[in-house]
A protein has these predicted regions:
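Extended charged
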Residues: 1-2, 201, 236
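Non-Sec secretion/translocation targeting segments of pathogen effectors
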Residues: 1-39
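Acidic/His-rich, divalent-metal-binding segments that scaffold phosphate/diphosphate chemistry
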Residues: 28-146, 157-159
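Short, charged, surface-exposed loops that flank catalytic or proteolytic processing sites
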Residues: 136-137, 210-218
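An active-site-proximal "capping" alpha-helix that borders the catalytic cofactor pocket
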Residues: 87-95, 144-157, 216-234
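Histidine/acidic-rich helix-loop-helix segments that form or flank divalent-metal centers
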Residues: 112-116, 156-158, 163-197, 213-214, ...
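His-Asp-centered metal-binding catalytic motifs of divalent-metal-dependent phosphohydrolases/nucleases
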Residues: 107-135, 152, 167-181, 197, ...
Length: 246
């Protein structure tokens, strides 16, 4: 079932009756993805990923179109693994634990956690001067930054990651109203897992210090996401699960 604003599922849940489920099934330990127990792909180490990037013709095509020189930034990837990806995975797994049962049944928790740990891997191919720019990105830089979803999809497709995880990675910046990226067509709607990942990703990013902004307090981050609900960018049930666990 797809989870979009114009479907009955938005109206079938009494949000006030959603009960918080404590102790989500989250693995804690070393955060190198190839070593996490819930990740079943042996070829997600840095060397295998770099080789996948070099030999993928679609990645070469995307980089050539935007005149981006090939560079696999392993240091940036390692930084993401230890910080933002770990944080996003923990938030996403906790959000899953707070969903009502009928929505939980639409999500594979292991796949969700893998997608959260992999979702920004495409940034290893984004030029560092854009990725860590202190000021606002211009139009061209923004277009290049937005390539990371599709680049991550292609990168991880090359090491055998399953399609459910890949779809969440590719479309974690898609929105229920169809205004996200990459362009997916009028009849596309992001899965519940992708929407959980999107909200967890944005919340984690807002709470972190970045080169272009200071870290936000929890209340500030939630207020921004509340506005996203009003704008149709986040489904109310997804936001409620986030609010309950943070």
């Amino acid at each position: 079932m797809n989870f979009v604003q114009n479907t009955p599922i938005f109206n079938k849940i009494n949000i006030s009756n959603i009960q918080f489920r404590s102790n989500p099934a989250v693995y804690t330990g070393t955060f190198e993805p190839s070593k996490d127990s819930f990740i079943t792909y042996p070829n997600t180490d840095i060397n295998a990923l770099a080789q996948s990037a070099r030999t993928n013709p679609k990645i070469a095509e995307i980089l050539a179109e935007y005149k981006i020189p090939f560079k696999f930034n392993s240091k940036e990837l390692e930084k993401l693994q230890q910080g933002h990806l770990k944080d996003t995975r923990l938030v996403a797994a906790k959000m899953y634990s707070a969903l009502p049962d009928d929505l939980k049944s639409e999500v594979n928790l292991k796949d969700l956690q893998e997608a959260a740990m992999f979702h920004d891997y495409g940034k290893a191919l984004i030029p560092e001067k854009i990725l860590n720019k202190e000021g606002k990105l211009d139009k061209r830089e923004k277009e290049i930054m937005e390539l990371h979803s599709e680049l991550g999809y292609e990168l991880l497709k090359g090491v055998g990651v399953n399609q459910n995880v890949l779809q969440m990675i590719k479309y974690h910046h898609q929105t229920p109203d169809g205004n996200g990226y990459p362009i997916a067509g009028d009849d596309f709607s992001p899965s519940i897992g992708a929407q959980i990942l999107s909200a967890a990703d944005k919340y984690s990013a807002l709470r972190e210090e970045r080169s272009y902004k200071p870290a936000m307090r929890k209340e500030e981050a939630l207020k921004i996401l509340q506005e996203d609900v009003k704008s149709g960018l986040i489904a109310p049930e997804i936001y409620t699960a986030l609010e309950k666990v943070v």
